[in-house]
Every structure is written in C-alpha cells, then in structure tokens.
Amino acid sequence: MSALLREKFGREVILEKPRDRSFGHFATPIAFALAKELKQSPMKIADEIASSFEDNNIFSRVESVKGYLNFRLSENFLSEYGSWALENPQTFAKQEKKEKILLEFVSANPTGPLHIGHARGAVYGDTLFRLARHLGYDITAEYYVNDAGNQIDLLGLSIQLYGRENILHESVKYPESYYRGEYLAPLAHEAIKKFGLEILSDESRQKELALWAKDGVMEIIKKDLANTNIFFDTFVYESTLYDDWDRVMAKMGDGIYKKDDKLFIASSLKGDDDDRVVVREDARPTYLAGDIVYHNQKFERGYDHYINIWGADHHGYIARVKASVEFLGYDSAKLEVLLSQMVSLLKDGEPYKMSKRAGNVILMSDIVEEIGSDALRFIFASKKSDTALEFDLAEFKKQDSSNPIFYIQYAHARIKTIIAKSDLSHDEIMSATLKNLDESADMLMFDALLLPEIVEDAFISRQVQKLPEYLKSLAASLHKFYYDCRIIGTADEAKLLKLLMLVGLSLKTGLALMGIEAKDYMSKEEE
C-alpha cells in the first residue's frame, strides 16, 4: 500500500491505523503536507485525491474527512491477497529491491566474550539484515575484527597474568588495565600445551601469545553469536589491511599532512571539530588509521550503500570517518552510521549481579542461558536502538501473558491447536473463501496482511522495534478474536480457520525475521 501511494504522490506517505475502525483500514494526512506546496486547502486537496480513487478496485471506499483521507480496502482485494499469501508463504512480504548493501555490525575486539552491549548491536544488526534480505536487497553481513593495536597486546599480558596466578600460583601485581574472566583459563592452558610454561613468564612473547589467542577468542565470539542465530558472511581482519597503507595515504592527497612528527587527517575541512592524528610520533597507527584503510577497501568493493552499527560512545567518531571517505574520493552520503545505546539489566527489580567468571561485564552467553535466545532477541529488538534500554530478566522468564515473547509465541501455538481440533482437511480449509466475514474477522485479516508494510517500514526507517510492536498487537487481536468468536462447529468454520492460518503465517514470518522460533505447541498461559 505504501508503494502504491508513494508512486501516486511521488513521495513517502505516512499511513495511520484509525483508532475508530469505522473510518476504514488506514488513513493518511498527505493533504496537509501538499497544502503549502499546492497553495490549496487540505480539505480541497483531500476531496480531489479521494475522487481520483473512484475506479480503483483495491479500495471499496476512499473518503475525505476534514483534510484526512480514509481508505477501506475492498473485500475482493483482501480475500484474494490473503489466499495468495497462504498459497505462496515463502514469498509473502517479500520484494525485489535491487540495491547492494554492506552491513557491518558487532565488530567487537577479539579480546573477550561478547557482553550485553555487544548483544544489543548484534541483534539490531542481524534483524536489519534479515529484513533487508527478505525485501530482496543484495546485503552482506560483515564483522570487522580489530586485531591490531594495544588491545591485542593487552590480551597477551592478561593471559600471562592469569596463568601465573592461577596455574603457577605466583603472587601477581595487576596493572590498571587488563582483561579478566574465566575465558582466560582455557586459553592459558592451551598456550602452555602449545608453547610451554615459559610462555607465561616471558614478557617479550606477549605479542606472540596475543596473536595466537585472538583466534580462540574469535571462536568464543562466533559461538555466542551462533547461539542467538547470528551469522556473518565475511570477516575482515584489521591486521591484513596495513599492507595497503601507502597506497591509501596517497589517495588521501591533501587530506593528510605531517606536523610535530605525526600524520594528521584534515577532517576539520570536512565538518569535523578538529583534525585527527592517524600516525603517532613513534610511527604507530591510531585506531582511525585502520578505519581509513578499511573504509577504502569497503568502497572499492562497489556497494551501493554502506551501513555501520556502532556503540553510542562512538558518536563523535562519525565525522572523522566520513571525512576520510570524502578525501578518498567517495560519496560519504553512501555511508550510514547507526548507533546502539547502553543496556541496563535488572533481575527481580534489582541491578543484575555480574558473575565471577565474567570479570567486570555481563556476558551475552549468561543472559541467553538464563532466558533463552528468543527472549534476548525480542528484548533487544523491542526498543529504538539509539535510546537507552532497561529490562528485568524476571519479566521474560514468566510463562504467561505478561511476557511479550511468550504472548506472541502462544498466539501461534493457539492457532495450531485450534486447527488440529477441526475435522476439516487442509484442502477444505484452503479452498474456503475469505469473503463475507464479519467486522472483527475482516479487521483481523487486515491486521495479518499488514506485515509487508511493517517489514518495509521497519527496514527503511531502521526502526526494527516496529516489527515486535506489530507482532504483539497482532497476537492481542488473535487472542481477543479467539475469546469473542466461536470457530469449531460453525457454518463458517472453514473460512475462519483459513483466517487463522493467515494470522499464523504473519506471526511465523515476523518472528523468523527477528530470528525467533514460532512455537507449534505451548502450555496454556495464565490469563
């Protein structure tokens, strides 16, 4: 529907669902947006637009009401579209977008397991990826591995310190910065097997130890991601990029200059607050240097659009990276940076206590173990990524309707249970018409068929929370319909079961796009 109206008006059209369903299936204030441009009153514009839809068989009624346009879809359109969706479940809500997109997300340092901050960005990125792929975009999910720099050296030191204290039983003085957590134990033991005990005491071999250990940490990270149904197409390692350093610096031209034995990028010329150091006086590259080479490599691969998902603490970093893209000769408008905000975790209303094995962070794997992958994914997709998120684990462990993921999954299971109780065959149900439904059934069908609009809107706006909001609303409509309407044994049993199948398809498709399982059976919730 959005696409039809977008084509008609040559712009994005805001669609609203009227609170009073008697007004129609949806409404739009487009006439108010056009009033200034056309120098006419919204009422007159709305009247003219309504008249232009008179011969359109998609709508049974298009009305102008005080400048608003109210649309009611025709019974034939809804019935035919619903039947088509059930006959073509694999293509329901799909499109054929042509744009080629590179989506980079997570990109956590290979120095320790993922924590809940990483988890939020991971779920956000993977949900965007799933939405884009469903819409037909040629999208690649990429992980940038920051395996160069001080943080890697610190990994080697941390393994040595852990091993000396816990394996050699030495008295160890810890520095101000180091990594901690039980994940270091297997790394220390494996290091001894590979290199011998001396690897724990030889400070000159910290780098060697770290470069070996990072692969083990990446396996931990990949396992954590796989346990939440998150997978990547490509991994790019920072350590492989610096062979291209001289060529990339030459491409930067006047964007790079030397001062006080340092190399700077003239990012202030491109909107940044200041120029930034890319190579220190001791010839060590900064974090930005790796990002410059990486983004050059990205753009040389020829995608149409590039999306980075970063932690909110990287907000100030956007301008300098976009400046480097401009100096490299590319259009920085093709680079979109989305931010993922902080997460606060409660358990029974109290701040969540970190486990001793995790060090000083709350591990993603701990939360998955406690509430499951489905609940974790739902939580992190349920609020705008650039706003702070606080949630209580206890709420998502409840097996009742107060738990939104249980509520949605139970709606799907309820549909399966109702259909299983019927004596009608699958073919008898599928051959039924979806016409001549009463108002409540008609609105439930409309709600189920809204999924394609929601999927496109959630991706284009980058607001993936619109999908779980929709699924929760659809589940509520289904549960209400179940209590208000008798189905089995009625004259309309076949068509009502077909309607429930359509709702089930939307629930299952929507949950799959969130990386969540649609349950076929669940124990009865406490209502």
Swiss-Prot record:
Presence of keyword Manganese: no
GO terms (BP aspect): arginyl-tRNA aminoacylation
SUPFAM superfamilies: Anticodon-binding domain of a subclass of class I aminoacyl-tRNA synthetases, Arginyl-tRNA synthetase (ArgRS), N-terminal 'additional' domain, Nucleotidylyl transferase
Enzyme superclass (EC): ligase
GO cellular component entries: cytoplasm
GO MF annotations, alphabetized: arginine-tRNA ligase activity; ATP binding
Highest rank taxon of the organism: Bacteria
UniProtKB keywords: Aminoacyl-tRNA synthetase, ATP-binding, Cytoplasm, Ligase, Nucleotide-binding, Protein biosynthesis
Subcellular localization: Cytoplasm
Entries under PROSITE patterns matching the protein: AA_TRNA_LIGASE_I
UniProt KW Ligase keyword: yes
PANTHER family: ARGININE--TRNA LIGASE, CYTOPLASMIC, ARGINYL-TRNA SYNTHETASE
Family: Belongs to the class-I aminoacyl-tRNA synthetase family.
Protein name: Arginine--tRNA ligase
Biological classification of the source: Bacteria, Pseudomonadati, Campylobacterota, Epsilonproteobacteria, Campylobacterales
